[in-house]
Amino acid sequence: MAELKNDRYLRALLKQPVDVTPVWMMRQAGRYLPEYKATRAQAGDFMSLCRNAELACEVTLQPLRRYDLDAAILFSDILTVPDAMGLGLYFETGEGPRFERPTDTLDAIKKLAVPDPEDELGYVMKAVSTIRRELKGEVPLIGFSGSPWTLATYMVEGGSSKTFEKIKKMAYAEPAALHMLLDKLADAVTLYLNAQVANGAQSLMIFDSWGGALSHTAYREFSLRYMQKIVDGLTRHADGRQVPVTLFTKGGGLWLEAMAETGCDALGLDWTVDIADARRRVGHKVALQGNMDPSMLYASPERIHEEVRQILAGYGEGSGHVFNLGHGIHQHVDPEHAGAFIKSVHELSAQYHK
């Protein structure tokens, strides 16, 4: 593997000194970029794009050609794991992801098998190794998965949900069934992420998109417990260096202390969290990633610049901050505004790393 030329993202996650605050964007390879739309059209549909290693590599690299980003993230989808478990993933126009065979009964859960990441998910591993090779050591590659709870919400509900009625009914009326599902998913995600590291991922991120829908105690029981299980089983060294792990629960600002106890290296913050407060609470244990409201990218470049200034000042001096949005970039954002955001982070952050 090529020697890593820019490792400030990995260094910041481990709270080692950096020259400027590293920056990348969730969904940086996505629909706001015209070149992404062209490649997706070439692929035919979203999952065909994910399953084609060369095209997945191409869209992963597209934002790096435009912007001075400090990391690349694998182009894939969190629902690849349940799809590999045989649920029949498809995308309904205007509806988002759906499953032909939801796992909403104990019987269905019992029948689920944990997929072999090198077999059923071999197309993801091929994409990881292709991207790592084509990056040529420019920046590190982030691998990722959804959290067990978040994957389970889609599997039990049969797709996206606003109320989470079916899975919450299972959580409170049939908790043993849900725990069986979450346990299988924790095993599947651990294998999946370790396979990504074996194929070239240099950092890992677990996206708990729907953990914030849970009550205080239910979050620990149904989400955090299974992320803890994954963290305990992850490969944390490869290529002679540490493989940092970031946990991100959207709406998880209440639980930062508990998340930091898992042994992860960093926590992702959404935009509802004050980063100065987060650093006071958990900055002695973990690095922090975030946390500009993605909608701020609709503002003028001058206003974006000011928002970046405020967030950097909120975190303050020293390493341990990876700048990002508080969630994925919106599809209608002007790519020039994303560029202004990235430039502002590098320009304004040097003073905090003297």
From Swiss-Prot:
| Localization, UniProt | Cytoplasm
**Part of which pathway?**
Porphyrin-containing compound metabolism; protoporphyrin-IX biosynthesis; coproporphyrinogen-III from 5-aminolevulinate: step 4/4
Q: For this chain's UniProt record, which GO biological process terms are given?
A: protoporphyrinogen IX biosynthetic process from glutamate
Alphabetized, the UniProt keywords read:
Cytoplasm, Decarboxylase, Lyase, Porphyrin biosynthesis
- Look at the named UniProt entry and state the broad enzyme category this protein falls under: lyase
Q: Which domain of life is it from?
A: Bacteria
* UniProt: substrate binding residues: R27, Q28, A29, G30, R31, D77, Y154, S209, H327
- Give the E.C. number(s): 4.1.1.37
> Which stretch is the leader sequence?
none
> One Gene Ontology cellular component annotation?
cytosol
Q: Where is it mostly found?
A: cytoplasm
Catalyzed reactions per annotation: uroporphyrinogen III + 4 H(+) = coproporphyrinogen III + 4 CO2
Annotated GO molecular function terms are: uroporphyrinogen decarboxylase activity
Gene3D superfamilies documented for this protein: 3.20.20.210
Positions of the record's site feature: Transition state stabilizer? D77
Pfam families noted in UniProt: URO-D
Q: Which family does it belong to?
A: Belongs to the uroporphyrinogen decarboxylase family.
Role according to the record: Catalyzes the decarboxylation of four acetate groups of uroporphyrinogen-III to yield coproporphyrinogen-III.
Q: What NCBIfam families does UniProt report for this protein, alphabetically?
A: hemE
How it assembles, according to the record, is: Homodimer.
Name of this chain's protein = Uroporphyrinogen decarboxylase
Source organism: Shewanella loihica (strain ATCC BAA-1088 / PV-4)
